[in-house]
Amino acid sequence: MASPPPPPKLPVPGRRNILVTSALPYVNNVPHLGNIIGCVLSADVFARYCRLRGYNVIYICGTDEYGTATETKAMEEKCSPKEICDKYHAVHSEVYKWFDIKFDKFGRTSSPQQTEVCQAIFQKLMENNWLTENTMQQLYCDTCQRFLADRLVEGKCPTEGCNYEAARGDQCENCSKLLNPTELIDPKCKVCKNTPRVRDTDHLFLELPLLSDKLVNYINETSVAGMWSQNAIQATNAWLKEGLKPRCITRDLKWGVPVPHEKYKDKVFYVWFDAPIGYVSITASYTPDWEKWWKDPDNVELFQFMGKDNVPFHTVMFPSTLLGTGEKWTMMKTISVTEYLNYEAGKFSKSHGIGVFGNDAKDTNIPPEVWRYYLLTNRPEVSDTLFTWADLQAKLNSELLNNLGNFINRVLSFVAKPAGAGYDSIVPDAPNAESHPLTKALVEKTNKWVEQYLEAMEKVKLKQGLKSAMGISSDGNAYLQESQFWKLYKEDPAACAVVMKTSVGVVYLLACLLEPFMPSFSNEVLLQLNMTPEESLSFCDDKGEIAKAKRPWDFVSAGHKIGKPSPLFKELKDEEVESFRNKFAGSQAERSSKAQADAEAKKVADKLKGTKLSDGGQKKEQKKQSGGSKSKNAEVDVTVAKLDIRVGLIRKAQKHPDADSLYVEEIDVGEEAPRTVVSGLVKFIPLEEMQNRKVCVLCNLKPVAMRGIKSHAMVLAASNEDHTKVELVEPPESAAVGERVTFAGYSGEPEASLNAKSKTWEKLSADLHSNGELVACYKDVPFTTSAGVCKVKSIASGEIR
């Protein structure tokens, strides 16, 4: 029977009480390695360190679930926002569990506690007159018949020198500048791709200018006392320098905390206002006595971890909200901010699926302690850092395997050797350790490393803390080598006993110091020492255990029997690195599509095994039997490879000025300029669905005039049996514009222009159709791109023309 969970921890008078939070990961996707090191993992390391020191600490985190991004993702996946949240909350929980993240509470913001706490804070702000009503202009989509929240709009960033083409309505991903949707150049609705219009709507605003004196006093005092990281101070000062402006706290959405105000009952709170309150509400779901953590600033220290794009929300917005209530809140003392972790040649991107994601890391079979170590040695504390597979390989093989793992394995393996060659797994006695010169020199170095470790960790300089611990391992290896213990065993047994007992103590010390960074590694080392995690060294000030580091030979008693040594790390080979680099190239969507395309191509190949993969195989055989050599050559020439079918992007579509049934499209097919194409699709596909979408385009038909406008290609579409329903043949969303559509088993270059006399198109099109799985096919062979196969929406066994 499982033991009941421990009771919630509460602040204890007279002890150091620390509340650790990580920026709440947004729930609309799988976290990538940049997200993980930026907040969740960094906070976990610090919380574990606090436990190591004996501080009374809780670590609070959870998924941020309200807002536009959730609604958008729900639309993409054709489900409700709650279903999206349930799905991705479980995904996040599983990823963090695999990474050995130890939360005291991992909650979510779509909870009753969130509504209760958020609305209570709002009421206090209303009572204290820090909120004002105002009319603002917001983008409204006539096609979707809704106001567009920030993340439902994309356009060109207006910031000089940036001009990023896919800036979101709330923030530019490229330059990190916070935006209003109306500031975007050429904005588009993310749902239908149409251009929205500006329309008035009433909202509530937090009067940041009126709170500025209180806020500036808080920032000036706390940034010094709390040793804020320099990047946090710079980002905050940049905001203050621009001048604080009233900030809207409501949005025209359905998915969120309802505003408890009659006039605004159909609106919800804006996610920037709502999300940081999630730290409080998740604590409230951890313990009903949450106020003992959040309303006792004299007795609780709040440490917050996040990426640099989250800084203003935590140093300006959230503190202003709490200050405005007039209540005595536990305000942030220390903020630890990371820059960006970039991936190989570009940026990690959750929205674009680029990089290695949490589930990807698990699939590599590289253990979580290796991922934790690599991310933490590469933690972007003062500037952007770069993830590369070669660097991961170097750090694993050199630092973990050859340094740390080698030291521990050499020590324990020698102790485990049978008597006459070692100590038969029994730790020897070493009464004269203090007078052994080489050991005294090692202890002096170790003490300095421990002091540096503690100093760095207290200042939340995690990378330096890890470096200090690893320095002990390097010195331990040098100590072993210089001692020549393998000779001492025969020549000076007493000295050898000192070296080995001291080394076993250093192994134990390393297991304890590295626990915050690599907990599963530490547990394994303790297991090989035949010790439990409960026997781990505590660096509590009141227990005097820091001083014990000066006598490492005393850590493990003489006569203690160790466990069975085994290698702690496995070499990462060049061919594995190359395999991972190829496997994780491109975006997640492209990788998924490629895997699907490979699987479908294999399926087709298996089906056609034993047959000749050329057009008209049976006809060809029949012609051969009848001796018609001329006809045979003609058949060989009529192959689907003659068709130049490409992935096209409709840049613009409009009604033909002189024909009610025709559209005129401008389609990008990867050439210098878009092609003009005329299509008879008006009766079947609404105009708004023809905008900014990818299609399959036959590009080598002879241009033909249609009601006065020359068409230079043909959009491929499937129709049902009675031609009452027509659907476009759609390539995968991540397929490259201009990429040629291919057919497994049919190779060759397309004709520049199809020969009308030979009726090539007429012959080949007779075998173009959608199959029972809605895949577009030539005979039984799918239309294939590098990103996957092309499909139709719902028409099975339809003709494609």
Swiss-Prot record:
InterPro entries with a match to the protein in the record: aa-tRNA-synth_I_CS (IPR001412), Anticodon_Met (IPR041872), Met-tRNA_ligase_1 (IPR023458), Met-tRNA_synth (IPR014758), Methionyl/Leucyl_tRNA_Synth (IPR015413), MetRS_core (IPR033911), MetRS_Zn (IPR029038), NA-bd_OB-fold (IPR012340)
Compartmental location: Cytoplasm
Catalysed conversion reaction: tRNA(Met) + L-methionine + ATP = L-methionyl-tRNA(Met) + AMP + diphosphate
Protein family (similarity comment): Belongs to the class-I aminoacyl-tRNA synthetase family.
Keywords: Aminoacyl-tRNA synthetase, ATP-binding, Cytoplasm, Ligase, Nucleotide-binding, Protein biosynthesis, RNA-binding, tRNA-binding
Residue span of region Disordered: 606-633
Pfam families for the chain: Anticodon_3, tRNA-synt_1g, tRNA_bind
The keyword Aminoacyl-tRNA synthetase appears for this protein: yes
Species in which this protein is naturally found: Oryza sativa subsp. japonica (Rice)
Major location category of this protein: cytoplasm
GO biological process: methionyl-tRNA aminoacylation; post-embryonic development; reproductive structure development
Name recorded for this polypeptide: Probable methionine--tRNA ligase
E.C. designation(s): 6.1.1.10
Keyword Lyase: no
Motif ('HIGH' region): 25-35
Motif ('KMSKS' region): 347-351
Gene Ontology molecular function: any one: methionine-tRNA ligase activity
Segment forming the signal sequence: none
A cellular component term, taken from the record's GO annotations: cytosol
